[in-house]
């Protein structure tokens, strides 16, 4: 598990056209919001991507880039994002090398299935039109997600690891908390406008 101010793992992944992209190129000019999805049948992933698409203008206006990493092949990722993440840069990691590098593990049965919070989230997502589907061949149904903010020095200033598969950070946290914090400086917490640090 990666921690605050730790160096972000820098890997080369493929975009939906099969072009190799090094992650450090994405955060070299401006801070990066890096989101890892689960599998393509996951309702919570579809909902998360929908929120990123909806909030993209505000996120980019605040000075952050956005990149999404999936388990799919470039071809499968292209089809998936054309429906659920139009306009977002999505990268393929079918070997899940980046998932491992960022400390994203396989969830247990209580994080992925036998959890009332997951059941409630699936029900809410279904009402929004996001259907639960089995993972495509080669994608791990137990893979956990994660969201990271990486500054231009390549440091992780916000690592978010899910407690369960429905635990993606709400858009309000990203827009009101994360984006109101000055990521050009070393992060010492807390996040949000007007937040005061605890005295030591």
Model feature map: region roles:
Residues 165-181:
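A short, polar/charged loop-to-alpha-helix boundary motif
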Residues 1-24, 47:
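N-terminal "domain-start" segment that seeds a small globular fold
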Residues 37, 70, 151:
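Short beta-strand/turn micro-motifs composed of small residues
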Residues 47-101:
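Structural microenvironment flanking redox-active thiols in thiol-disulfide oxidoreductases
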Residues 81, 88-89, 93-166:
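Thiol/selenol-based redox catalytic cores and closely related redox-interacting motifs
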Residues 184-200:
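Cysteine/selenocysteine-centered motifs that mediate thiol-based redox chemistry or coordinate metal-sulfur cofactors
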Residues 23-52, 65:
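Short active-site neighborhood of thiol/selenol oxidoreductases, capturing the structured segment around
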Residues 4, 10, 19, 56, ...:
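Domain-level signature for proteins that mediate thiol-based redox and metal-cofactor handling
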């Amino acid at each position: 598990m990666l921690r605050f101010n730790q160096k972000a793992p820098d890997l080369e992944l493929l975009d939906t056209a099969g072009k190799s992209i090094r992650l450090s190129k994405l955060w070299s000019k401006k801070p990066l919001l890096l989101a890892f999805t689960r599998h393509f049948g996951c309702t919570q992933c579809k909902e998360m991507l929908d929120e990123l698409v909806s909030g993209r203008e505000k996120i980019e206006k605040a000075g952050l880039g956005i990149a999404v990493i999936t388990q799919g092949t470039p071809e499968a990722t292209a089809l998936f994002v054309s429906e659920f993440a139009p306009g977002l840069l999505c990268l393929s990691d079918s070997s899940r090398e980046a998932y491992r590098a960022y400390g994203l593990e396989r969830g247990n049965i209580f994080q992925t299935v036998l959890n009332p919070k997951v059941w409630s989230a699936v029900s809410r997502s279904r009402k929004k039109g996001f259907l639960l589907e089995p993972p495509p061949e080669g994608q791990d149904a137990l893979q956990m997600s994660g969201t990271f903010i990486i500054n231009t020095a390549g440091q992780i200033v916000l690592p978010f690891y899910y407690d369960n598969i429905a635990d993606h950070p709400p858009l309000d946290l990203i827009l009101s908390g994360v984006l109101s914090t000055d990521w050009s400086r070393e992060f010492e917490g807390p996040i949000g406008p007007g937040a005061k640090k605890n005295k030591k």
